[in-house]
A protein has these predicted regions:
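Conserved SAM/SAH-binding loop
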Residues: 51-54
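FMN-binding flavodoxin-like domain, especially the glycine-rich phosphate-binding loop
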Residues: 3-14, 18-26, 30-47, 57-219, ...
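Iron-sulfur cluster-binding cysteine motifs and their immediate structural context
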Residues: 224-226, 230-258, 262-280
């Protein structure tokens, strides 16, 4: 009789940057379904690297890790403020499922950029996706997304990704392979997953007015209506750049703003607002120009 071989275990976790919670929603949905798909898949705690402190820690993985890795799209690319952190990741042969979430305009080169970063950091990307979420600037553009239909798509995507991952650890007859053979198969055969996007990467998307003039909103920051602020401190906690600080009895925006709008959308009193004319013009142009529902794009 041949020796009994146990299936190679996989440790599944989500890892995400999510200013308003939309990327988190998709990443966790995918990770949950992958973890339930096979008996040898096990759910591990997620890593939320939205808080600045979380991006100061080292993250090291190995060949038995499956990381569903999600970031939002900013200006058609991976947010440039995340690049130094992403360059510290150590995949060490881990499997990754890169996911980007965009606000109904276009994900441009964000997905291929994220895939390339993960590959360069030692991950094997075997499946990838671009999902849609409510635009950070707006409550109209892709309002309420990801919605129930998106979560259903995420579940189907996760099942397909799980089947692909598990195929690396079984032989042609569907029998579990010895651990060393399974690891070798992952290292030699897994990824990179083909995705949409251009190489070399295109420049960051720049908003324009209808005459083609560039609208610069890089230094735009939200303002605080002190008559509405109750000093609850939620904004201090949710700002991913650590740029909202106490200025008792209120708060002040004192640092880089990436316009994730977590402060504006999560403030229970609606105390944050934007009044920059260029920003408001660009927001309206997005709402008028991209009203049609877009659907997720999946790559397995």
């Amino acid at each position: 009789m041949g020796r009994e071989v146990e299936a190679m275990p996989f440790l599944v976790r989500g890892m995400y940057f999510s200013g308003t919670g939309t990327t988190e929603k998709i990443v966790t949905a995918v990770a949950e379904v992958i973890a339930r798909a096979e008996e040898n898949f096990f759910r591990n705690p997620d890593i939320d690297f939205t808080p600045p402190a979380a991006r100061k820690k080292p993250y090291r993985f190995g060949p038995q890790d499956v990381v569903v890795f999600g970031v939002p799209v900013i200006a058609g690319r991976v947010p440039n403020v995340l690049l130094p952190f992403l360059d510290t990741l150590e995949g060490n042969g881990a499997i990754a499922v890169p996911i980007v979430l965009y606000g109904n305009r276009n994900f441009d080169d964000a997905l291929i950029e994220l895939r390339n970063i993960l590959q360069e950091r030692g991950f094997h990307t075997v499946a990838a996706a671009a999902f849609i979420g409510e635009h950070s600037f707006s409550k109209v553009l892709a309002a309420g997304r990801p919605d129930e239909a998106d979560i259903d798509v995420a579940a189907d995507f996760a099942k397909a990704a799980a089947a692909k991952i598990n195929a690396y650890v079984v032989d042609a007859a569907g029998e579990d392979q010895p651990l060393d053979e399974a690891l070798e198969k992952i290292l030699t055969e897994a990824g990179p997953v083909p995705v949409d996007g251009e190489q070399p990467l295109r420049p960051y998307y720049k908003p324009q007015d209808r005459q083609g003039n560039h609208i610069n909103i890089l230094k735009v920051k939200p303002k605080l209506d002190e008559t509405k602020c109750t000093g609850c401190g939620i904004c201090v906690q949710v700002c991913p750049m650590g740029s909202i600080k106490w200025d008792r009895p209120y708060v002040k925006v004192d640092g880089i703003c990436i316009k994730c709008c977590g402060c504006e959308k999560k403030c229970p009193e609606g105390a944050f607002y934007f009044d920059d004319p260029g920003y408001l013009y660009h927001k309206e142009e997005l709402e008028l120009g991209y009203p049609e529902r877009k659907e997720p794009k999946l790559f397995v």
